[in-house]
């Protein structure tokens, strides 16, 4: 279905493209998606918050109290700057964030934010961020 989607992609509006991608995903991986729906919307470690789209950072250390599930999966604005934990998210294309339409890697704001959405459906690459717990450093692999 991936090739079928790529062939249609150029002729579809963004909303139609998203709808078509969702339809094909359910057709190919419906059982997997149903299983994944039972997972929590975020994962938190001592140093990181991993979330699909983002959190309400204005809540500071109480971010979870003020962040809706809808925001965790649908946030469309990019957060930048220092936060008390690293926020690792996807959802927003790193090409869009970087201002480089062909960029497909991990984008880091130089402080607390890492964005991983490398537009895999187009690039064929899955950006992977590795964290070394001994050094506290990240690297793209």
Where are these regions (language model features)?
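Hydrophobic/aromatic beta-strand positions that recur at structurally equivalent sites within the blades
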Residues: 129-131
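Acidic, His/Gly-enriched loop-helix segments that form or flank divalent-metal centers
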Residues: 2-125, 134, 139
């Amino acid at each position: 279905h991936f090739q079928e989607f790529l062939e249609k992609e150029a002729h579809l509006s963004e909303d139609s493209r998203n709808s078509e991608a969702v339809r094909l995903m359910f057709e190919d991986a419906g059982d997997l998606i149903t299983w994944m729906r039972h997972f929590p919307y975020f994962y938190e470690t001592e140093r990181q918050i991993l979330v699909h789209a983002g959190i309400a950072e204005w809540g500071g250390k109480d971010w979870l109290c003020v962040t809706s599930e809808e925001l965790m999966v649908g946030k469309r604005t990019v957060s930048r700057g220092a936060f008390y934990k690293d926020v690792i998210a996807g959802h927003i294309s790193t090409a869009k964030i970087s201002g480089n339409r062909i960029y497909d890697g991990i984008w880091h704001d130089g402080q607390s934010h890492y964005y991983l959405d490398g537009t895999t459906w187009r690039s064929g690459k899955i950006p992977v961020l590795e964290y070394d717990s001994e050094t506290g450093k990240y690297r793209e692999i």
